[in-house]
Every structure is written in C-alpha cells, then in structure tokens.
Amino acid sequence: MANKHLSLSLFLVLLGLSASLASGQVLFQGFNWESWKHNGGWYNFLMGKVDDIAAAGITHVWLPPASQSVAEQGYMPGRLYDLDASKYGNKAQLKSLIGALHGKGVKAIADIVINHRTAEHKDGRGIYCIFEGGTPDARLDWGPHMICRDDRPYADGTGNPDTGADFGAAPDIDHLNLRVQKELVEWLNWLKADIGFDGWRFDFAKGYSADVAKIYIDRSEPSFAVAEIWTSLAYGGDGKPNLNQDQHRQELVNWVDKVGGKGPATTFDFTTKGILNVAVEGELWRLRGTDGKAPGMIGWWPAKAVTFVDNHDTGSTQHMWPFPSDRVMQGYAYILTHPGTPCIFYDHFFDWGLKEEIDRLVSVRTRHGIHNESKLQIIEADADLYLAEIDGKVIVKLGPRYDVGNLIPGGFKVAAHGNDYAVWEKI
C-alpha cells in the first residue's frame, strides 16, 4: 500500500511538472521574409543557431512553410508532399534541423498553409485548377470541385461555399469536402511521423471556419497549435486604436472556444500587438483596460494567447505593421514578463543586437516560473509609466519616468534594464 501511495505521489508530481513545463512555453519565429535567399539554404544556416536558441530557454521554434511553392517564401504552396523544392532547403536538411532541435529539447512548429493552394495544370477551360500532391499516387491530386464554389474564376460551381475570408491570389480550398479533409489530415500526420514536426502554425486561419480548424487539430493531435487571425482593430478619427477593443479580442477568444479551449489551440494576440504598438509612443495608459486588466486577449484568456512584437509580415522587409524600432525592447519587456505565450522574432534576436537583452528577460521569466496564466497586477498606467507585478515575483516598468522607487516594495532587486524599461525580481 505504501508503494502504491508513493507511486501515486510521484505520478502527481510528474503530472504537475508536465503541466508547468507546458504552460512555460516560449515560441521563436525562426525566419523572416528574406530567409529563402540565404546562400547554402536556410535550414543549414539555422542549424548553427540551435545551441543559442536552446540556451535562451526557447521551447518551440516556428519554421517556414516547407512545401513546394510558386512564391519563394512558401505561402503559395502547390505540391504539399514535395519538400525538396523549397527555397529554404530540402527534406533531408529539414529533418536534420528538426532532429537537432529535438536533441536540445526544443519542439518544431510547421507553418501550415492550407486555406489556398496553387494548381499544377489547367483544365479544359484554360484555368489553373488541377492540383498535384507531390507523390506518385493520387494523394492531394485534386480538381476544380475541391475549390470553393464562390471562388471565381477557379471554381467549377460544384464545391461548397467558402467558410471564411477570400484569398484572392490563389484558389480557396473547399474544406467541407470530405476527401480534402481526409487527405490534409493524412498530410499533417505525415509531417509529424515522417518529418518530425510537433505542432502547427495555421496561416490565414480566418480563411476557413473554426469548425474546420478543429477537424485538423483534433485528427492530427499536435502538442501545440497557433492560428493567425489578423483583422483590423477599431480605430478612432485620430487614426489611433480605440480604448475599447473588446470586439477584436472577442473574435480571437471565439475562435479558440470553437476549436476547443481544452486542447492545444491558441491564437496570436493581435489585439495586444496593436495596442502595444501605440502605447510605447508615450501613451502607456493604454495598457490598462477599462476593467483594470490587460487590454488584449491576455486580459481575458492568457492561456490561449500568443503575444509578439513583430513577425515576417508586420516587420522584416514587409513592414506591414511594424513596432516602433527604437522601442522594441519595451515590447519584449512587456510580453516576456506577462501572461500569455511570448513569441520572439528572429530579426530582433539575431540581427538587431538585442540577443543579450532578450536572453536576460527570458531568464527572469524562466527563473520565476512566469507562465501563460500568471497573475498580473497593474500598479500604474500613465502616459509615461507602466508598472505591473506578475505572480508577486517580478515587477516590470515601461516608460521614461524614473521616480518609481516608492512604488517598488522591499525585497526586490533589478534583474534587467534598458532603454525606458526595467525589470525587478524578488530576492
């Protein structure tokens, strides 16, 4: 009986440890918009960065789309099983990179682009809508009846209506078609079993319904999944975000809820991204919502929110929605001390000379067990000062104001600091 009690106790300890590790995730985007141009291949190049990535405390690396694509970056895929035609490298190099990550205890996340697909051949109408899967057999060899019926001119009118937003540059795939579902699930499971991927980042996830995403997640069982649902915030007449962004973050929460809140699904917290972009420009009061909590998705459902400063679209050479470049470390001081799962961008870590500063912040997060559901207490949120305490162990300050000594309780010491930010940790 004693042995049984001991075994049960050990099981509960390990279960708790497993849950703690799962919630302490730090994601890293391992590429930018120009990575495909790298001499010798990006997969080979990134192999040389694995030690630094693992040493930083990063738990997951998001890799670029791996399949053959008519766009060099991988976001216009065609032959999904063909991983040898990628501009980032070939299948063997990809597997070696994933093996190296696994050897350091880091998981690999695939960029899954399935909303749309480019065709290999024209049909009798002269329209490119005959797809080739990239295998000798008929897997993923589809025709126009696998295209959403309302996606003209590609469709032949036999498919189901689109369940999400239209993507104009390529045919929108009919995800209500049972063969489409079956063969995409098989492909996802092949990426796991044969290539070694552990989870998914769903590109343009607003292009198909959450019910569809649930099918792919439930039937492929990734350990981690994050969706890109990028929609516009609500803006006022001054061109700045409204104080209340509840409708915007509700869309993100609704997606996760429909996919299955108890599963691995998360979404990028575009609400926090948009607010933080403006807040660091002398409007730090924006970081306290009308309910006194964080104003983004992390204020409502932090366990399912992936926070970020920039990515290959918002930053890099595309600059669609860039974070103020001279305040990037304020952004990292925020996301790396707050609840939610933070995502670090390759450019900032390796190309901007910010590696040591980001390393220190991740170390503070790891050392004090800050995780995606940590308790956030906002102490001050004024134009020039944001001050918050996390789990009673870490305090973060953003903004140029320096007279905050009276707001920092005893028993804390400075753990990291830089341009208009500082972090204290409990001694």
UniProtKB/Swiss-Prot annotation:
Active-site residues, record numbering mapped to chain: D203 (nucleophile), E228 (proton donor)
Binding site for substrate: 75-76, 201-206, 230, 232, 250, 257, 293, 299-301, 312, 318, 397, 414-420, 424
Chain positions recorded as Ca(2+) 1 binding sites: N115, D162, A165, D172, G207
Domain of life: Eukaryota
Reaction equation(s) it catalyzes: Endohydrolysis of (1->4)-alpha-D-glucosidic linkages in polysaccharides containing three or more (1->4)-alpha-linked D-glucose units
Entry binding sites for Ca(2+) 3: D151, D166, F167, A170, D172
Top enzyme category: hydrolase
Cofactor(s) listed in the protein's UniProt record: Ca(2+)
Family matches, as InterPro entries: A-amylase_bs_C, A-amylase_pln, Alpha_amylase, Glyco_hydro_13_cat_dom, Glyco_hydro_b, Glycoside_hydrolase_SF
Residue positions binding Ca(2+) 2: E132, T135, D137, D141
Quaternary organization: Monomer.
Similarity comment: family membership: Belongs to the glycosyl hydrolase 13 family.
Protein's name in the database: Alpha-amylase type B isozyme
Species, as recorded: Hordeum vulgare
Protein encoded by which gene: AMY1.2
